[in-house]
C-alpha cells in the first residue's frame, strides 16, 4: 500500500507502508497556528477534537 505522508499543505509525498499495513490515514485538527493535517500509514486512534479519515487504497489519503 502507498500512502501520502506530507504534513499540512506541503508538497505531496508518498511512502510505501510496511508490515502488511492496509490503511492510510489523514488526521486533521486546529491549534494556535491554524489548521493542521497529518498523513501516513495505519489508522491510529485519536483524542477528542481530532478528525481522522482512514482508507484502504493507494494514495487515498490526500
Swiss-Prot record:
Residues 1-16 have a biased composition (Polar residues). It is found in: Secreted. Gene3D superfamilies: CD59. SUPFAM superfamilies: Snake toxin-like. Keywords: Acetylcholine receptor inhibiting toxin, Disulfide bond, Ion channel impairing toxin, Neurotoxin, Postsynaptic neurotoxin, Secreted, Toxin. Expressed by the venom gland. The keyword rRNA processing does not apply. Its main location: secreted. Disulfide bonds join 3-24, 17-41, 43-54, 55-60. PROSITE patterns: SNAKE_TOXIN (PS00272). One of its GO terms (molecular function) is acetylcholine receptor inhibitor activity. Binds to muscle nicotinic acetylcholine receptor (nAChR) and inhibit acetylcholine from binding to the receptor, thereby impairing neuromuscular transmission. Belongs to the three-finger toxin family. Short-chain subfamily. Type I alpha-neurotoxin sub-subfamily. This is Cobrotoxin II. It comes from Naja kaouthia.
